[in-house]
């Protein structure tokens, strides 16, 4: 979706623009994290904040994508934005609630040689916080 949207913007390619819009509709029709018919959380991982996401998905990643393609103010982002705001820590900032990698000096699947700030339910992660503030500002909520 992001690649198609950027390509369409730079080349004015109508087919790519339409494909990006259709892809956005898949996410928006599910409020970025809810089952379209059940209204329940599709996957518990979607409502946890991670950094970095790599090839995975969470609600903040979905919101970032909507901000980048200019769809963050779509009313169907409201529940995801509310969820994000609810995760703000009392002292400010947002936590990385779960890690998708382990720090390692060797080459293994799902490892990284960088520590991206760790995970904690009570301590803000600077990367997650920067992304959350960017999204909320783009949505007119900051």
Please report, for each region that a protein language model flagged, where it lies by residue.
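An alpha-helical repeat/solenoid feature that recognizes helix-turn-helix modules
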Residues: 1-79, 95-142
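TPR/TPR-like (Sel1-like) alpha-helical repeat modules
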Residues: 84-85
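Aromatic-lined carbohydrate-binding surfaces of glycoside hydrolases
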Residues: 92
């Amino acid at each position: 979706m992001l690649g198609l949207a950027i390509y369409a913007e730079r080349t004015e390619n109508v087919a790519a623009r339409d494909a990006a819009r259709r892809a956005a509709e898949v996410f928006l029709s599910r409020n970025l994290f809810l089952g379209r018919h059940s209204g329940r959380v599709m996957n518990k991982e979607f409502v946890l904040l991670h950094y970095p996401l790599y090839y995975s998905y969470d609600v903040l990643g979905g919101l970032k994508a909507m901000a980048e393609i200019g769809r963050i103010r779509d009313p169907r982002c409201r529940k995801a934005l509310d969820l994000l705001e609810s995760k703000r820590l009392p002292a400010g900032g947002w936590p990385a609630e779960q890690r998708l990698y382990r720090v390692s000096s060797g080459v293994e699947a799902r490892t990284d040689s960088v520590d991206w700030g760790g995970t904690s339910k009570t301590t803000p992660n600077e990367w997650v916080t920067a992304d959350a503030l960017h999204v909320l500002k783009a949505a007119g909520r900051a």
